């Protein structure tokens, strides 16, 4: 499904859903000739993962695509060799899961028309890119020859790569694939003990429907029959992100999604993009010859390691969603199954294969969290759920879209600010790297070679890799390697992440910007000082000059020309889907990390939190822009640069496209400009906009029905390239949405609808003139050149190909005239086929099929057509359906091999049997319910993890940011010590135990000196060494931050939740909610007024909830609603928590805290004026949330004042610090701008 990085985003937000797959390594033994041979695994033994699975479903397109161009070795030269790769990969997957009941292998058949538009766009772009790449290679070869240099035989041949567009139903390749899989299944049944009891269903490309949807159709129909076991354990393999949504939609809890580990590639050793050798990067390449492996370089390189696999556990995801989606005090009963359906539906808005997503919704901008926040807010008013067992409740959808519409202007404005900031950083990096490249170019790297011709662009791209937080690697290196002997680890962190002003304003300082820059920086930090590096570089240049006369070897030329592409593809290039490998400027933390809303009922606070999230995701978004969709339709032409399809536009070496965005969503009037440019109409044309809205709503209804009930219409499609705005959706309840089922295209009709003329080799010759001759009635369907609208995006692959939509009637009329010219085999390939069921002779079904299907030869009333027979579920393990004879099967005969060239021989005395198989009838419509007899899966989330989810952070930070007692779980990875504690120079830590700490009862943990944790929901009795521990046995008081390095304060019950102490000017943590987060008075009068504005300390300590602390006033007043502001004897009004103070020179103060959580009744002695919330003192941070007064930024006795905070009431605008030269900007009513 078209939701880039959704799998990664989910695995980061809900980390327990992912687990590693354990594989059993095959054993080896000496063969007859003495060489080692690999012994087959005995998959009848227990599963090494400690869990047995019943059914395994393979979305085969996710296997076939990568097997046509496997990683780490040359691509197969013939299609038969590709089949062998498919067998090997499939066997590995089956060996991991070891299904005990059913294996289903589904290949994409003819797709619904709604999907064909996307297929058409992908295939046209892939073919065009392949053609232009081939032309580029030919031009480079000609330039090479013009210099009088020789070329290798391979270069002389320079044949075009295999056309991956052949992986489309109806082609000879797909016909060979179907025959090959049937052979392989029969061979496994005959030879593998682990296959003796399982049933295998093959649904090849002749059966209409997308592979994953055919699988889900099978599951839905099975569960509508009483024979279905609701505790069946399912596993589905595939690369599409929508497998997660489809699995949830089945409402079968025991479901896992299997795929390659998308994070594994991040640990892969990097090599130079110029010479292909490890140990250095292109910027420091000396052109040295490759070191020999053995005397004559005869030792083969180590074969690439197999990529690990991971499970995504749907049961655990359901457990997370139960916490995430459960809204307290709903006016109707909470139904998890229906809530999950709503969540799936909201994901469709962010991306799917059938509709363009709304302009305001980008997963990188936090779109899912935005929609979920709106859903939570509107659900009580909706009176029920958005969806109803696969049907959209349009009136309720109106509320969601109206809520989104109210935020669209702000979303576009924030997006532009983020993009401008990233662009500024990118240009800074570019300038820095260009200077370095210029210095390298001054050294003569040889006298012109083909490597230069083919690698020039790669080299330019290599030098543009971004560094940490906009600081170039050189700048960071110079700072880190400075001659200052008083090295401070906190200063090192600042070098890597920018100063704390950047941390506060840009929010990207703690992010690893990219893996290559990180490794380069790490290597260079371990090396020599800058002067010595210059000397080394000078020596290297001299060495190159002395060796310049020697021509590069053929091996090195080929390595430089082709090998590096396998490890570092250009930014715009399609990735191999099984790799999900990053472009060179992507880091290991490359999922957009969106921070959730912070406080229920506080919409403005939610908006502010999203603003922080957008800034947090800056580096992540840059990496994600390079990462294409999770999808099993991956083009085989990895080395192709799609930017070549964008004409008359400047394309940067990193794959971004320079163009003028004339719509300018961030400026007033964008709707008028959008409709004029994208649709060619005026915004005032309400009838047209209404037609677009209706088509889009039809699409949403179509997609939901497709996921839950099956194809609602084979002919429907969205007839526009662009979507409307959320503000355009009005009066949805009045729309009448109806679908006609129709029938699918035939295979050749789909081929002619989605393939370009460049791929006509996969189409029968009879149809070629329709694609190439100028007098063809449908020649306009096959443009060789087409416009790509960047639609506000920056990466080439994100552009929209403006291809003409296929007119179904014109296409079918043109094809009809040429059908008589087809051969007999082509007529067969153009027909629809059947699913095939295989079992072995040890299966309980074998005798049943032999007797009922092949012995009795039942027929229908015409005496010729075979009659369908119902499968006996008692023999099949509960699997139902209908079977009839397979015309090519003769039990006990010879199974002929379709791959004789690969030494795969015929199977004599075949012990397998095959029959044609139909899914069972759908007894009742699919319902979003759990079936009777289900044994609920074991819950795995701990109380702490549940609480973490409730606080809503997708990247290990809780909703308590700036909110005093609220904690944020584990600290960030970059500064983490054991069990989630934050290191010294950061001012907050998670509420977990430290590396040398103890845990109080019910979660009142405190930690070691590295970031001592905060109190939880109660702590043990205070001890003499627990410096600020105020609690009583059984009181439930929150534990305070421990010692000098305080972390969060706890939730006070009747106890006292105390924040961390100063700790020598810079290790203060969050304040603890002073006197109980929600105003509970402490039990000890000696507590004092300290915690009314707890959280002092430099390096970013957050302030606490003020004005709820106990503070003895004049005459011993014990009123817990008011706190002394500066002196215990003086009331000045409701005290807001102050930010961190007393920072070291390199550190900066933090946020101020909140004032009282509610309007208290008047005290005996009312305050003279309300208190303001002040930011940190030194190098002021953000201002706090004021009471009815202004929220001031940090008072700046030293350097700059911080930004103003949120005020309240008519006088409560946020103000900056009172320093003319360093004042931060003020913000009105909570804006952080």
UniProtKB/Swiss-Prot annotation:
This is 5'-3' exoribonuclease 2. Residues 414-441, 531-548 have a biased composition (Basic and acidic residues). It comes from the Eukaryota. Residues 977-987 have a biased composition (Polar residues). A zinc finger (CCHC-type) spans 270-287. It is an enzyme of class 3 (hydrolase). Interacts with RAI1; the interaction is direct, stabilizes RAT1 protein structure and may stimulate its exoribonuclease activity. The interaction also stimulates RAI1 pyrophosphohydrolase activity, probably by recruiting it to mRNA substrates.
């Amino acid at each position: 499904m078209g939701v880039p990085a959704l799998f990664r985003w989910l695995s980061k937000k809900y980390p327990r859903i992912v687990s590693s797959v354990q594989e059993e390594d095959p054993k080896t033994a000496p063969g007859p000739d003495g060489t080692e041979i690999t012994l087959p695994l005995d998959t009848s033994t227990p599963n090494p993962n400690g869990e047995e699975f019943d059914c395994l479903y393979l979305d085969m397109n996710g296997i076939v695509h990568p097997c046509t161009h496997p990683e780490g070795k040359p691509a197969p030269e013939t299609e038969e060799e590709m089949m062998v790769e498919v067998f090997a990969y499939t066997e590995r997957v089956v060996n991991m899961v070891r299904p005990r009941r059913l294996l289903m292998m589904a290949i994409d058949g003819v797709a619904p028309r709604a999907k064909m538009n996307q297929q058409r766009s992908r295939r046209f772009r892939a073919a065009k890119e392949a053609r232009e790449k081939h032309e580029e290679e030919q031009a480079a070869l000609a330039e090479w020859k013009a210099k009088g240099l020789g070329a290798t035989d391979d270069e002389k041949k320079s044949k075009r790569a295999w056309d991956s567009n052949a992986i489309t139903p109806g082609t000879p390749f797909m016909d060979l694939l179907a025959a090959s899989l049937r052979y392989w299944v029969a061979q496994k049944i005959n030879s593998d003990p682990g296959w003796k009891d399982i049933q295998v269903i093959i649904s090849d490309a002749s059966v209409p429907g997308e592979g994953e949807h055919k699988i889900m159709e099978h599951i839905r129909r099975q569960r509508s029959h009483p024979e279905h076991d609701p505790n069946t354990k399912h596993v589905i393999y595939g690369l599409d992100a929508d497998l997660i949504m489809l699995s949830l939609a089945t409402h079968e809890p025991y479901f896992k999604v299997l795929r390659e580990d998308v994070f594994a590639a991040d640990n892969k050793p990097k090599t130079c993009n110029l010479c292909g050798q490890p140990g250095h990067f292109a910027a420091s390449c000396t052109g040295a010859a490759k070191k020999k492996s053995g005397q004559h370089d005869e030792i083969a390189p180590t074969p690439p390691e197999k990529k690990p696999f991971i499970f995504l556990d749907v049961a655990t995801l359901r457990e997370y969603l139960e916490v995430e989606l459960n809204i307290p005090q709903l006016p109707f009963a909470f139904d998890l199954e229906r809530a999950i359906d709503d969540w799936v539906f909201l994901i469709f808005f962010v991306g799917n294969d059938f509709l363009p997503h709304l302009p305001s919704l980008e997963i990188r901008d936090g779109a899912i969290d935005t929609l979920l926040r709106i859903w939570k807010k509107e659900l009580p008013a909706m009176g029920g759920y958005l969806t109803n067992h696969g049907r959209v409740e349009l009136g309720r959808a109106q509320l969601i879209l109206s809520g989104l519409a109210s935020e669209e202007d702000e979303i576009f404005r924030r997006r532009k600010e983020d993009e401008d900031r990233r662009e500024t950083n990118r240009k800074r990096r570019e300038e820095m790297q260009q200077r370095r490249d210029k210095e390298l170019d001054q050294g003569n790297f040889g006298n012109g070679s083909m490597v230069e011709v083919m690698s020039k662009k790669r080299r330019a791209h290599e030098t543009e890799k971004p560094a940490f937080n906009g600081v170039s690697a050189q700048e960071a290196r110079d700072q880190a390697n400075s001659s200052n002997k008083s090295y401070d680890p906190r200063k090192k962190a600042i070098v890597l992440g920018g100063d704390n002003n950047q941390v506060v304003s840009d929010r990207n300082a703690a992010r690893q910007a990219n893996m290559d820059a990180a490794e380069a920086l790490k290597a260079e930090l371990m090396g020599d000082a800058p002067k010595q590096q210059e000397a080394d570089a000078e020596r290297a240049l001299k060495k190159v000059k002395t060796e310049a006369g020697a021509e590069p070897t053929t091996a090195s030329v080929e390595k430089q020309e082709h090998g590096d592409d396998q490890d570092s593809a250009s930014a715009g290039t399609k990735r191999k889907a099984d790799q999900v490998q990053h472009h060179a400027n992507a880091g290991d933390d490359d999922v957009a990390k969106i921070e959730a809303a912070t406080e229920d009922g506080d919409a403005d606070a939610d908006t502010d939190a999203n603003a922080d999230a957008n800034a947090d995701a800056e580096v992540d978004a840059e990496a994600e822009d390079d990462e294409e969709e999770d999808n099993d339709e991956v083009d085989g032409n990895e080395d192709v640069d799609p930017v070549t399809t964008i004409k008359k536009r400047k394309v940067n070496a990193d794959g971004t496209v320079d163009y003028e965005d004339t719509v300018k969503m961030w400026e007033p009037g964008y709707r008028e400009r959008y409709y004029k440019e994208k649709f060619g109409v005026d915004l005032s044309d309400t009838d047209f906009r209404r037609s677009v809205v209706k088509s889009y709503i039809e699409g949403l209804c179509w997609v939901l029905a497709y996921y839950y009930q099956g194809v609602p219409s084979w002919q429907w499609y969205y007839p526009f390239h662009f979507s409307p705005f959320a503000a355009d959706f009005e009066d949805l309840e009045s729309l009448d949405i109806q679908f006609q089922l129709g029938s699918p295209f035939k295979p050749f009709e789909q081929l002619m609808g989605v393939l370009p003329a460049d791929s006509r080799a996969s189409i029968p010759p009879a149809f070629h003139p329709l694609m190439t001759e100028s007098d063809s009635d449908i020649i306009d369907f096959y443009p060789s050149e087409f416009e790509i609208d960047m639609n506000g995006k920056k990466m080439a692959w994100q552009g929209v190909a403006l291809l003409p939509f296929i007119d179904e009637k014109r296409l079918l009329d043109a094809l009809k005239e040429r059908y008589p010219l087809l051969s007999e085999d082509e007529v067969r390939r153009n027909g629809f086929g059947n699913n095939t069921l295989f079992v072995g002779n040890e299966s309980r079904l074998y005798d049943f099929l032999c007797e009922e299907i092949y012995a009795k030869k039942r027929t229908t009333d015409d005496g010729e057509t075979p009659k369908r027979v119902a499968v006996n579920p008692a023999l099949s393990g509960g699997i139902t359906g209908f079977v009839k004879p397979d015309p090519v099967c003769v039990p006990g005969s010879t199974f002929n091999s379709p791959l004789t060239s690969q030494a795969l021989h015929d199977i004599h005395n075949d012990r397998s049997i095959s029959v044609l198989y139909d899914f069972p009838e759908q007894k009742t419509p699919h319902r979003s319910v759990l079936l009777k007899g289900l044994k609920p899966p074991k819950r795995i989330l701990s109380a702490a993890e549940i609480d973490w989810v409730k606080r809503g952070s997708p990247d290990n930070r809780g909703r308590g940011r700036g909110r005093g007692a609220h904690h944020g779980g584990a600290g960030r990875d970059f500064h983490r010590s054991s069990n989630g504690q934050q290191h010294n120079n950061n001012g907050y830590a998670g509420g977990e135990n430290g590396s040398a700490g103890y845990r109080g009862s019910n979660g009142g943990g405190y930690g070691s000196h590295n970031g001592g944790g905060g109190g939880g929901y109660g702590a043990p009795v205070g001890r003499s060494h627990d410096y600020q521990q105020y609690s009583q046995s059984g009181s439930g008081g929150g534990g305070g931050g421990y010692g000098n390095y305080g972390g969060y304060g706890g939730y006070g019950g009747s106890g006292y939740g105390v924040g961390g102490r100063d700790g020598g000017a810079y290790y203060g943590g969050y304040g603890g909610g002073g006197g109980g987060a929600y105003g509970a008075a402490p039990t000890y009068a000696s507590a004092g007024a300290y915690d009314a504005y707890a959280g002092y300390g430099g390096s970013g300590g957050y302030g606490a909830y003020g004005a709820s602390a106990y503070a003895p006033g004049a005459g011993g007043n014990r009123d817990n609603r008011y706190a002394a502001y500066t002196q215990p004897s003086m009331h000045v009004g409701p005290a807001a928590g102050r930010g961190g103070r007393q920072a070291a020179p390199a550190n900066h103060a933090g946020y101020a805290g909140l004032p009282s959580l509610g309007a208290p009744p008047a005290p005996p002695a009312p305050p003279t004026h309300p208190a303001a919330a002040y930011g940190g003192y030194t190098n002021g941070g953000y201002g706090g949330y004021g009471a009815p007064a202004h929220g001031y930024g940090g008072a700046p006795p030293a350097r700059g004042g911080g930004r103003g905070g949120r005020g309240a009431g008519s006088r409560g605008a946020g103000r900056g610090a009172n320093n003319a030269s360093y004042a931060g900007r003020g913000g009105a009513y909570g804006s952080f701008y």
